[in-house]
């Protein structure tokens, strides 16, 4: 049986963590980005399908390609973030299932139903994006996830001719706490949950 993590760990991962819009001028190394992927690949996905593909943009040239896809409210915070991750999903993720889920012909579940394949890829890549956010926090990084961007532009600029489609963007770095908004409320258990 697993042991519960400490209250301090829960605070780091959830209750004290914030969504950042401003960044300190501290770089995030490529080694750190590799460290981020190491734990998130173990996060659960349907039939171990692992559809997320992540592009870490950390160069001026990469940000310039991303720039036209950003909404006005997300522009400055993205251009100043040390890293922006494009979390995409592979529309042909099922081609890896003979390796990732060798317990049956899982590939055929999805080749026979394009709708199921798309729903599965989008849903599970969204979960993997959440794992990335938690991994960032665990390694002392801050994040700013965003869905306010032109997905088609991102797909054309970064994934043309491939099977990848963008899901969301996550700015990653060391946040500038002086630029945080006041903490916003959350729904209570009674408002968000039910017991049957």
From Swiss-Prot:
CDD domains reported in the protein's UniProt record: RutE-like
Enzyme Commission (EC) number: 1.1.1.298
Residues spanning the signal sequence: none
Keywords assigned: Flavoprotein, FMN, NAD, NADP, Oxidoreductase
InterPro entries given in the database record: Nitroreductase, Nitroreductase-like, Nitroreductase_HadB/RutE, RutE-like
Induction (record text): Up-regulated by the nitrogen regulatory protein C (NtrC also called GlnG) and repressed by RutR.
Recorded superkingdom: Bacteria
Any Pfam family hit: Nitroreductase
Statement: the UniProt record of this protein carries the keyword Flavoprotein: yes
Cofactor names: FMN
UniProt catalytic activity: 3-hydroxypropanoate + NADP(+) = 3-oxopropanoate + NADPH + H(+)
Keyword 4Fe-4S applies: no
Enzyme class: oxidoreductase
Stated family: Belongs to the nitroreductase family. HadB/RutE subfamily.
Primary role: May reduce toxic product malonic semialdehyde to 3-hydroxypropionic acid, which is excreted.
This protein's name: Probable malonic semialdehyde reductase RutE
Protein source organism: Shigella sonnei (strain Ss046)
